[in-house]
Regions:
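An amphipathic alpha-helical core segment
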Residues: 182-194, 200-211
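N-terminal alpha-helical interaction modules that lie
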Residues: 1-157, 170, 190-195, 209-256
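Outer-membrane beta-barrel transmembrane domain signature
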Residues: 167-190
Length: 256
């Protein structure tokens, strides 16, 4: 209950600056709950996702982002490990063994697996200058693919948005799969009924810019700016998406 209440109070805010200034108090409170209940997997999963969000979007500098997402990663790992002993050594073998072990995660544990994947991805984003981070991306993608296999509608299809981004990181000439990226973004929009504005922003930023499709780029961003930000569990993300959409649209002519 405490984890749900804390998460909701942050995600329902439509003022990113207020969250930037006030969220550290929530994170400290959540840390306190976790220290008193170190085996509460729901609290750990909530901590993983909130630290991932704050580290990715509100950290003051690169080093701070690394520190915050490192904690997110630690919480995400701990939650899955506490639920399944075999998960404690999940990353110690090779990639093939890792993927095989992921198949043991069931629908009952989808919250934990999602938090594990998202917190890892936030850490890799914060350390993207490190080639080790690049090498770990397939591991995160495999975890997200497992979430997808368990329930592709989970979190209003947010996992499709992440997979859309991952599949657009490389151009076709370097082995990228833009058609797969586009399919994921379209599915994410469908599942959220267009309410997840962040998906449209990433669709424009990652896919449309990669493919030099200005018409799609500008249409998606205009839709974001014209849409309401308020949506259950998405209000903060949508407010941030609107900020990003304004910046991207302002540089459209220059980019294309």
């Amino acid at each position: 209950m405490a984890a749900d209440t804390l998460s909701a109070s942050i995600l329902e805010q439509d003022d990113p600056q207020l969250i930037q200034e006030g969220a550290p108090a929530y994170l400290l409170l959540l840390d306190g709950f976790i220290s008193r209940n170190p085996e509460d997997t729901a609290l750990l999963a909530a901590g993983a996702q909130l630290y991932a969000l704050y580290g990715s979007r509100f950290a003051a500098d690169e080093q701070r982002a690394i520190e915050l997402t490192t904690k997110a990663r630690r919480y995400g790992r701990a939650a899955l490990c506490l639920e399944h002993e075999w998960a404690c050594s999940l990353e110690l073998g090779g990639y093939e063994t890792y993927v095989e072990q992921l198949s043991r995660v069931t629908r009952r544990d989808i919250d934990l697996l999602y938090a594990y994947a998202v917190s890892w991805l936030s850490y890799l984003d914060a350390t993207s200058d490190d080639w080790t981070a690049v090498a770990e991306l397939p591991w995160v993608e495999a975890a997200l693919q497992r979430v997808l296999a368990l329930d592709d509608t989970y979190a209003n299809g947010a996992v499709h948005g992440y997979l859309g981004t991952l599949n657009a990181l490389r151009p076709p000439a370097l082995g990228g799969m833009p058609e797969v990226s586009q399919a994921h973004f379209e599915r994410a929009i469908e599942l959220s009924e267009g309410r997840d504005l962040g998906v449209k922003v990433e669709y424009a930023r990652r896919y449309a810019r990669l493919m030099f499709d200005q018409e799609l780029h500008d249409r998606l961003l205009t839709e974001v700016l014209e849409a309401p930000a308020d949506a259950p569990g998405l209000t903060l993300f949508n407010a941030l998406a609107k900020e990003d959409a304004r910046r991207l649209l302002a540089t459209s002519e220059e980019y294309f």
